[in-house]
């Protein structure tokens, strides 16, 4: 099969077949199965230690960004991309914060959250429910609150 890419896969470490791994082993390392995932309640524990209302867990599938976790051998390696689920217990919230270098996307799998997006002059608030998605550009503060009676689960 001809390589139609305008770049070389070898230029990006996580896109290159590791030395000593067969093609099948390499491709298997790029599959993240739900049964091998665990919820990491410690990734954002420093916030929950400040106030229990900030308790939430991350279940990583690809990459380790977004929460300051620097390494996780149980994820699909990635360059500049993170894919995880977040569990937000009823009544808990993600405090207002900003990412200046990345867009952040939330996709609601179940539950409902109140999402607030702000800059210096504006504020926006909405309720996200099952299968809703929002994209927050870099440079905006965002915060969320589980307004439902059950845990919220989002990508």
Predicted features along the sequence, with ranges:
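A short, N-terminal "cap"/entry segment at the start of jelly-roll beta-barrel domains
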Residues: 1-80
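Conserved short histidine dyad/triad with adjacent acidic residue
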Residues: 62-72, 82-100
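Glycine- and acidic-residue-biased ligand/ion/polar-headgroup-sensing regions
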Residues: 90, 101-114, 118-119
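Histidine-centered metal-chelating micro-motifs
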Residues: 93-95, 114, 132-134, 138-143
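A short hydrophobic beta-strand segment most commonly corresponding to one strand
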Residues: 105-107, 135, 150-155
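Short acidic-glycine-tyrosine-enriched beta hairpin
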Residues: 119-138
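Asparagine-centered strand-capping/turn motif at beta-strand->loop junctions
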Residues: 145-148
